[in-house]
From Swiss-Prot:
Entries under Pfam families matching the protein: Thymidylat_synt
Species the sequence originates in: Listeria monocytogenes serovar 1/2a (strain ATCC BAA-679 / EGD-e)
Recorded family membership: Belongs to the thymidylate synthase family. Bacterial-type ThyA subfamily.
Positions of transmembrane segments: none
Origin: domain of life: Bacteria
Protein name as annotated: Thymidylate synthase
Amino acid sequence: MKQYLDLEKYVLENGTQKGDRTGTGTISTFGYQMRFDLQEGFPIMTTKRVPFKLVVSELLWFLHGDTNIRYLLQHNNNIWNEWAFERFVKSDDYKGEDMTDFGLRAERDPAFKEVYQAEMEKFKTRIIEDEAFATKYGELGNIYGKQWREWKTSQGETIDQLADLIEMIKTNPNSRRLIVSAWNPEDIPNMALPPCHSLFQFYVADGKLSCQLYQRSADIFLGVPFNIASYALLTHLIAREVGLDVGEFIHTMGDAHLYNNHIEQVKEQLSRTPHALPKLVLSDKPATIFDFEVADISLDGYNPDPSIKAPISV
């Protein structure tokens, strides 16, 4: 997609070198927006392969209100493993090799990388096979799904923001309050990772549903391709439920950054030419957005260039 390649190019040419929480370092810009017309095809990278089924299982995980990686691992989705693993290796229950700064060390030290990968595999197996262990160490805190579906009130009750949003679109589509927030300051200290994509708003006009996301922190090379596809999919799912066509997905970013150890991968991607966008295919079976399963969602005509590997910064 040209919009995304333009973002990469803009940050490479105009970004500022900054330090960051992970110690990796970034090239960063503040305040950037992309717009995608969802009528023109499903917005997923074609200049590198994005594993769409991982996008789907993560979004369904959010929609279920789940915050434990066990569901993800049961669907062969490893994108949240590092944050749960980090919590485990910092606990008194962990008795293995020292895992301090495991992400950076695995990138720089091949011998340590083998040790880290072995420990990670043991951790994943225990999460899947041991429910008690998963309950304790698979939890990521009150992240996205919890805030979307069970926002805690001061009276001890909960708010299902997503269900309320869908009902409001049906009954009051002109409302300017069609908003869901994942940013709950009270819960931030207990989250494995505070929400990067922190707030989204819907807008209805001319029989079409559009979505705007505000993302406080945008990992351009690894995270943003997932975020675009995820919120485009969410827009399609909600539009289907409320009987509207899809309009635009507008992606507004705060700190949009390229990690310093992703620069060569970015340059490789910029050398590629975008292909035609695929079409989203949804099963007619699910009654509501909350009834979808991974097998109900697919892409038709997705023929991307090969994937480009890059390390994740934790």
